[in-house]
Every structure is written in C-alpha cells, then in structure tokens.
UniProtKB/Swiss-Prot annotation:
ATP binds at G472, S473, G474, K475, S476, V477. GO terms for biological process: cell division; chromosome segregation. Residues 252-304, 731-753 are annotated as: Disordered. It comes from the Bacteria. SMART domains: AAA (SM00382), Ftsk_gamma (SM00843). Residues 264-273 have a biased composition (Basic and acidic residues). Residues 247-817 are cytoplasmic. This is DNA translocase FtsK. It is a multi-pass membrane protein. GO terms for molecular function: ATP binding; ATP hydrolysis activity; DNA binding. GO terms for cellular component: plasma membrane. Residues 452-671 form the FtsK domain. Consists of an N-terminal domain, which is sufficient for the localization to the septal ring and is required for cell division, followed by a linker domain, and a C-terminal domain, which forms the translocation motor involved in chromosome segregation. The C-terminal domain can be further subdivided into alpha, beta and gamma subdomains. The alpha and beta subdomains multimerise to produce a hexameric ring, contain the nucleotide binding motif and form the DNA pump.
Length: 817
C-alpha cells in the first residue's frame, strides 16, 4: 500500500464510539418524551380540577365538613380554589402554554428561551385576569371578588386610581380591548407559537436526528400546528431510531456512511476501482458556519447622525433610516449540516464519475453560494477540473457552477448556488462596524464574501476601478452602492464627483447634490471635454504639491491645514534673477494662498458610447488619469456593459489593475475583463468577481439598493446646500487659439494688466466664464479663475447659477439706450 494513504473503511473503535453516542442520544430523547408526557398529564389534571371546581369543597379558604366533589379529590379542590381565588376564570387560558410545552418536549426535545417564556406566561396570566375583571359579575358568581380573582382586581385599581373609581361599563370594555392584544401576544410567545425564528438548535439533539428519520424531524420543526399528528410523528421517530440503532449495533449497517459531529465530520469518498490507483484516504473535513451578520457600529446605535461644519452652515450626513432595513429570515433547511454532508458526498461521487480523484476537505456555506474545497489527488491537473464546470452543474442539478484554484493552497474551490438566495442589503453594510471603523479614505461597501463576511475596499489604494457586466447583472446597482458609500462618509469639502452618464438614465437622479462639480454629463462630446479638464486639474494639483514640497494629496492637505490652524501663510523662497553689479542671485519670498483640495471621483457609467464618439481622445485621457492621478487624489470608476476588446483596450486594462466583473455571456468576455474564465458562471443580480491588485480574484455578493432609497438620500442632500459648479468642466476650448496667443484682444493691447483686459472683454462680449477669459487672453486656467473670482468680489459679475452661468452686474453702453 502506498505510504500516506489508508483504507476508507471505518475502524472498530470509531464505530463503537459512534454507537455509544447514538445510544446516549436515544436515551436522552426518551427522557424528553417522558418529561413531555408527564407535563401533559399534569396539565390535563389541572384542567379536570378546574372543570369540577366547587366553592363548597373543603380547601385552605373553606374549612367545612362537606364531602369533596372535585374529580381529583382534596388536592384538586385545593388547587382549583387557589387558582380561582387569585386568577379567577383566567386560570383556564393560563394552562395553554403548559400544554404546548409538553408537545414541544415530546416532538423537538427542548423548549427554547425557557426563562423568557416563563416570564411571558406569568404576564399573560395576569393580563387575562385583568380582562376577566373588566366584565360585570353575575349574580350566580359565588365569590366576593371579581371574575379575574385577586390579581385581576388589583390590576384594575391602577386605572381606577386615575378615573376616580373602579372601571365599569364602556370604560371597562375599552380597557379589556386594550389589554387583549398584549395578553394574546404574551400567551402565544409563552406557548412558543411565535418568537421561534431566532432560537438556537439544541446541539444535544442534532446527532439523534441524523438517520432515516430526518424527514420526520424536519416536518415537525416546520409544521407546528396539529398536536395529534406531531404526537404520531414522535412515536414513529422513536420506532425508527430504535430500529436503526439495533441494526448498527448488530453489524447490519456497517456499510452505510456515518456522520460524526458537525465540526469534525468525516468525508468518505466512494472507492473507485482505477488501475494503479491507491485506495482513497479518509480525512476529517471541516464544515464552517456562515459568518454572522456584520456587527453594527456606533453610528447605527445613535439616533442622530453626526454633523460636519461647513462654511455656510451645517452639513448633515444622510441617515441610515433612508435605506431599507434587512429582513429577518430563517435559515434555509438546505444549508443544514446533514444536507451539506450529503451534497459533499454527492459532489465527490460526481467528480469520481468524471475521473477526478480527490476529497472534499472543507465546506463554506454562504448567503448565495456554498464553497466546496476539493483537494485533488497527486497527478490531477487543475485545468481538467476547471473544464468540468458545466458537467458538475448538470450533475448537481444546479444553475451554474464555478470552479477555480484557491490561491496559496493545494485546493480547488467548487462554488454551487444555494436553493434559496439571501438578500444582501446596503444598510447592513453601511451600519456595520467594519465600514464605520475602516481606515480607508474612500471606502466602498462592495458586498459580502461567500462566507458572509463584509468586503470593504478603498478606492484611494486601487486607485481606479473597471466594472463590466451584461444588462441585468447588477452593474448599475453596484455603481449606486459605490456612490452611496462615498456620500455616507464624505462631505462636499472632502470629496467631489464628476458623473458621466451617456445613457441619461442611471446617474441623472444625482443631479443637484452638493458633491457634484458639474451637472451630470450626458453628452458624449462634453464627456470628452470633462475628462480633458480632469487631466488639467491633475496637472495643476501636481504643480501645487510641487510648490509645497509634498508627494500626495494627503500630505498637501495636512500641510495646508496645519498652516491654517496656526494662522501662518505657506511661503517659499524662489530665485528671481541676479544682481547686475555683484552678480549674486536674488531671492524673494513667495507666499502661497492655498486651500485644502478635495478628492475627485470620476464616474463613467457607459464607456462603450464614449469610445464610439471619440475613442482616441477618451483612451488618451483615461490613460493619463489612470497612470498619474492617484497621488493627486483623482480616481476613476468606469463601467461598461459591452466588455469587448474595442471598448476595454489593452491600454485601459493595463492601467486598471482593479476590476469587477458581473455576469457576462461568454468565456471570451470573462477573459477580456479578468484574464480568465468564470464570470460567465455567475448568477446575476449583484453576483460579482472582484479582482484586486495582484490578480487575486474574490467572489462577492453585492448589496441591493432600490430607486426609492436613492431618491430619499438625494432629496436629503439637496436640502443641505446647492452645488458649486465649475462651468469650465464642460465648456469646449479652442486649443488653436490658445496656443498662438490672445484671440480677439487686438483693441486691448494698450493695457498691460490682464485683469483690465478681462474686464473689457466681459463688458464688451457680455460673457463671463473662466474658459472664455482663458481663450480670449491666452492665459492659464488658474489665472483666469482668479480673475473671475476677483470680478465677483468687486461686483462686476454675479455668482454662478445652477448651470454655471454668471450675470454681468455692471451696466454697459448698450444698457443706457
């Protein structure tokens, strides 16, 4: 036998240990059934005692020599007298939880939340007593207290204290109606009819429910109505358990596959009679639980959202209440321990049928898919297993199956969709502690991993993202989640947005929020101009950072903020020339008037339309931004629904190391985006493959956000202030005029001051914009912007409106006539 392998047949000691465990579980199960029968008997005796109650029977409150007429004798007379004295007629409905508890013990073997349900039982009994006391006492009532007993009268004295007397008539009826709902809720909760969605499964009973009787146990857990059928199911459960245990102990069930405890379960491969192949070895496989929901951060626990100071007031961040709250759903029975074990064995058998030898070593269930980790036998090529993705999906009766090598491990991941898909909500991601306490400067909530863990990415480190996917794959929803992730963390002073939407549908809803630098660009020609402006802004930022002597935008903002805090201007010493007499260099101190620079995120929703209009210009601008804009704080999120080589060119791919692929139609499109196949096997609706820097691919399930949620957030942001648009972003420039010299300024050569020339141009042409002054005077953008700001300060032109236009306030010669 080859070293390192062992037979797949179980050892004798393991079988004995397993049989002992099953026998112990069987005994424990019978104890619970006996306890349930005992409790049911006591409940029936209590009902019989109350049904035959007679006030004349001897008891603690009546010392008489009359014969006992109660069906249970003197103990029944004492019990019924005490119950009627304290609770009155409410003693009868108060016995309902006890009857349900007895059935639960016999069927399920445990009662969840017993402490809380006991308190709810007491509360229900008291409320039922108060309701009974609200009714008028008939003349035939033999007791001097109300129908609700002592406790009912005591509770009604509370409203009587405020009403000035014991409630009667219509007031008593109203009080009874008010108390009816909480009384029923307490009664149902105490009985276990409601409030069972979050109960934990009793681990002691798991092993007892793992045989041929699993179907009965599942039916009992799902269908809780009908006590008679459940009792029959419990007896059938007992018979099957006893038969199965006897067969195992006598050796008849040795060839049946056994399941150990869930955390240390053993995956046994089906033996394949292959020539020169050693028998498969049995290894312990670890089945992981789904990661718990992300823990909410401090922001989700505060009632009011934090406020950030702004120059013209207070900017209030959007509230998490604008987003839909995650719904509580019960765990899918298909993801139970037994079901995962069975699927793992079935998958191992399918692989052996196709000639792939190996074993399942790990199982990771998630909200959308389940990952089965396969450790192949020596000599098995990973490409062979990857090529079987369609055959595996067919054999496992799944919609699709994705097979990929797990980086850094000797394992191949096989991802199969769950029968029931769970929804991932954006509110759950933004309220999580991982997102709020993330140190990322521009954090994006991408979604959850296969195991249910949140994925928070930093676009400042990416530094650009390429998103691709077909229509309906969830690409537009992912763009919205990225935008909302920025809006929930960044103020307009910290991050500004440029949105380019040639489709005129997806991003137009954000038009008017204060984070925008320009209205949403829908014209492809203006989109080219906006990208060129972004390139010029990047170059201008680099010049500013060079003057200050820093290497990135964070260092620049820190340096400028520190100078503003101290009240000291930033100055530098520059050489202006040489002294004519001595020849020594002349140095002057230049004061720099600088402000902190916000991050700029350029969002392009459809790249294919732009490439059709101006492919070379778009590709050149995107290439320069992708190569150089990271240190300047400018980042690009580019999306397309046509992932072909004419849209995603080699130049663009080389400069976008971070890529996200949603469902595509073919393997060729998947290779175009990610460099490998697999995206064609995605499930759609936010299911994505996230490739971070370095080529490591991770499957992520994106969160969902509805249009109504986006509209509520946008309306809130619009109330915080108007956007400060820059008209130069979308105004086309005539490079030919600007390169040769000032255009149209022949009559202004007598003035050496550019400001005077600019004022004359504005008054003559009645046009006031930064780009217009820049073209007419042949000066740089920064200088033209300073001139326009000076004109606004001196009252020559007004502030820019929502479209970026300015009104000329100084009357011209034409206005006099």
């Amino acid at each position: 036998m080859r070293q390192g392998y062992s037979p797949s047949y179980p050892l004798r000691d393991e079988r004995i240990t397993e049989d002992r465990l099953r026998f112990a579980n069987l005994v424990r199960r019978q104890v619970y059934i006996l306890l349930g029968l005992g409790l049911l008997s006591l409940t029936a005796m209590a009902v019989g005692a109350l049904a035959t109650w007679n006030v004349a029977d001897p008891s603690f409150s009546h010392a008489t020599d009359n014969p006992v007429t109660n069906a249970l004798g003197y103990p029944g007379a004492v019990f019924s007298d005490l119950a009627m004295q304290f609770f009155g007629l409410a003693s009868v409905p108060a016995l309902l939880p006890l009857a349900v508890w007895s059935l639960l013990l016999m069927i399920r073997g445990y009662i969840g939340r017993i402490a809380r349900r006991s308190l709810a039982w007491v509360g229900a009994a008291l409320l039922f007593a108060a309701i009974a006391s609200c009714f008028a006492v008939p003349q035939s009532w033999p007791m001097p207290i109300g129908l609700g007993g002592v406790f009912g009268d005591m509770l009604l004295r509370i409203p009587g204290f405020f009403l000035g007397g014991f409630p009667q008539g219509a007031i008593a009826s109203a009080i009874a109606l008010v108390l009816a709902f909480p009384a029923l809720w307490f009664c149902f909760f105490a009985s276990g009819i409601i409030g069972r969605g979050a109960e934990a499964v009793n681990p002691a009973m798991l092993s007892a429910n793992r045989s041929a009787d699993d179907e009965f146990a599942d039916e009992d857990a799902d269908n809780e109505a009908g006590g008679g059928f459940h009792f029959i199911g419990a007896l059938t459960h007992l018979v099957l358990m006893t038969t199965a245990t006897i067969r195992r102990m006598t050796g008849l069930g040795r060839r049946r596959s056994r399941e150990d405890d869930f955390d240390d379960m053993r995956m046994v491969r089906r033996s394949a009679e292959t020539r020169n192949a050693p028998p498969p070895r049995a290894r312990k496989a670890r089945v992981e639980q789904t990661a718990p929901s992300p823990k909410p951060g401090p922001r989700a626990q505060r009632e009011a959202q934090p406020s950030f100071l702004k120059d013209n007031g207070i900017f209030e961040m959007p509230s998490l209440h604008f987003l839909a709250e995650p719904k509580l759903v019960q765990r899918d029975p298909a993801l139970s321990k037994d079901a995962l074990e069975q699927n793992a064995r079935l998958l191992a058998g399918v692989l052996e049928d196709f000639g792939v030898r190996g074993e399942i070593i790990n199982v990771k269930p998630g909200p959308v898919v389940t990952l089965y980790e396969l450790e192949p036998a020596p000599g098995i090529k990973s490409s062979r297993v990857i090529g079987l993705a369609d055959d595996i999906a067919r054999s496992m009766s799944a919609i699709a199956a994705r097979v990929a090598v797990i980086p850094g491990r000797n394992a191949i991941g096989i991802e199969l969709p769950n029968p029931k898909r769970e929804m991932v909500y954006l509110r759950e991601m933004l309220a999580s502690r991982d997102f709020e306490q993330s140190k990322a400067k521009l954090a994006l909530a991408l979604g959850k991993t296969i195991n249910g863990e949140p994925v928070i990415a930093d676009i400042a480190k990416m530094p650009h993202v390429l998103v691709a996917g077909t229509t309906g794959s969830g690409k537009s929803v992912a763009i919205n989640t990225m935008i909302l992730s920025l809006l929930y963390r960044m103020t307009p002073q910290e991050c500004r947005l440029i949105m380019i939407d040639p489709k005129m549908l997806e991003l137009s809803v954000y038009d008017g929020i204060p984070h925008l630098l320009t209205p949403v660009v829908t014209d492809p020609k203006k989109a080219v101009v906006a990208l060129k402006w972004t390139v010029r802004e990047m170059e201008d930022r680099y010049r500013k950072m060079s003057k200050v002597g820093v290497r990135n935008i964070d260092g620049f903002n820190q340096r400028v903020g520190l100078a503003q805090k101290k009240g000291e201007p930033i100055a530098r010493t520059v050489q202006t020339g040489f002294d004519r007499n001595t020849g020594e260099a002349i140095y002057e101190t230049e004061e720099l008037d600088l402000e902190p620079m916000p991050y700029i995120v350029v969002i392009i929703d459809e790249m294919a339309d732009l490439m059709m209009v101006a492919g070379k210009d778009i590709e050149g601008a995107v290439q320069r931004l992708a190569q150089m804009a990271r240190a300047a704080g400018i980042h690009v999120i580019m999306a397309t629904q046509r992932p072909s080589v004419d849209v995603i060119t080699g130049t663009i791919k080389a400069n976008f190391p971070t890529r996200i692929s949603f469902q595509v139609t073919s393997k060729i499109d998947s290779r175009t985006i990610l460099g490998e196949q697999g995206a064609e096997q995605l499930l759609g609706q936010g299911d994505m493959l996230f490739m971070a820097g370095g080529g490591r691919i991770q499957r992520v399930h994106g969160p969902f956000v509805g249009d109504d949620e986006v509209e509520r957030i946008v309306q809130h942001l619009k109330l915080q202030g108007v956007p400060e648009y820059l008209d130069a972003i979308t105004e086309d420039e005539d490079d030919d005029e600007g390169g040769s010299g000032p255009a149209g300024t022949g009559n202004l050569e007598d003035s050496d001051d550019p400001y005077d020339q600019a004022v004359a141009v504005v008054l003559r042409d009645k046009k006031a914009s930064t780009s217009y002054i820049q073209r007419r005077l042949g000066i740089g953008y920064n200088r033209a912007a300073s001139i326009i700001e000076r004109m606004e300060d001196e009252g020559i032109v007004g502030p820019a409106n929502h479209a970026g236009k300015r009104e000329i306030l100084v009357p011209t010669g034409d206005d006099d006539f």
